[in-house]
Amino acid sequence: MSNANPFFSQSLAERDASVRGAILKELERQQSQVELIASENIVSRAVLDAQGSVLTNKYAEGYPGKRYYGGCEFADEVEALAIDRVKQIFNAGHANVQPHSGAQANGAVMLALAKPGDTVLGMSLDAGGHLTHGAKPALSGKWFNAVQYGVSRDTMLIDYDQVEELAQQHKPSLIIAGFSAYPRKLDFARFRAIADSVGAKLMVDMAHIAGVIAAGRHANPVEHAHVVTSTTHKTLRGPRGGFVLTNDEEIAKKINSAVFPGLQGGPLMHVIAGKAVAFGEALTDDFKTYIDRVLANAQALGDVLKAGGVDLVTGGTDNHLLLVDLRPKGLKGAQVEQALERSGITCNKNGIPFDAEKPTITSGIRLGTPAGTTRGFGAAEFREVGRLILEVFDALRTNPAGDHATEQRVRREIFALCERFPIY
């Protein structure tokens, strides 16, 4: 229409060139770099479309059928789809898909099942846990008496005997099983037995491995835990957000009240639409094939790195992530993160268990295969990426501030690799 309101017709490029320019530069970065950050992935065009939809306009405080605003008929439809699909994926009786993030999901569980001052037992951040599991800077470390378990110095594996001893000693009301940098499977049955022995509730934070569990390649924590939290991105390959699952109806009621009105107001309906799409994708056989490739690619990348002279914490991986110990190369995590980014490879510096370096320096990096696998990389491509990473490592040993020639050459090879597997 010739008299159309430009507010509704002008594109982002026409209305705000500065923001559009930044987005285009980020798109180019994602297209031309290899993403190895283990907590990142690449969503489908369908998820992008859902998250950029008119649902961003809709306030929908409450839950389907029980909203505090009118006009929620179709918001209800979208949220019901998300709930039904995620329940089907994980064989759960109840689901809340409104948490804006994994941290919000974890906070909701703590609000529902613990009181300020209660003891909470979780994995320490320096052993591979997450901030929200009782780290001192986080709310969970300030409002609760946070006791932390770790890993064995000999094996770098979770010390379940220590977990049990700490539980018996401190009698927590909530035990948390989950991680942000732990490459091995979790024994949910053992965690539940420990929780039952002291009358604690067990919360599993499956954020990193939700996709692996969805594909049936890891035990399902819903069968063991009182409550399960997760993000919707990472291996599940959805938009950034969270959700909570339980088979206990009374806990489900408490969780719903904790999410709204306890922690949040209106849900982000456009994000919930993206979640619904991603959950639908996770129910397909193609998704199971994808996860199998994620796991195989992690093995391929790890094999190359080990052969090249670095150590992998625990000696390898059972999932999508690798925790790389750089000490055999005499390198630091921050130094390597920066050099790899200059070379077209993004990862993050990460402490290793019993690390002597500061968190801003670290002795390790964390790598993951979900994003590269999404864009189509197979084992051959990840072996090539591993070879290029080792070249950057070895150049840093000679030139600790960075070897420009090596980094530029690697960057060209990475760019050529990415061009073979385009995104968007």
Swiss-Prot record:
Broad enzyme group: transferase
Pfam families recorded: SHMT
One of the GO biological process terms: tetrahydrofolate interconversion
A GO term for molecular function: glycine hydroxymethyltransferase activity
Reaction equation(s) it catalyzes: (6R)-5,10-methylene-5,6,7,8-tetrahydrofolate + glycine + H2O = (6S)-5,6,7,8-tetrahydrofolate + L-serine
UniProt site (Plays an important role in substrate specificity): H233
Modification type N6-(pyridoxal phosphate)lysine: residues: K234
Sequence similarity: Belongs to the SHMT family.
Subunit organization: Homodimer.
Protein name: Serine hydroxymethyltransferase 2
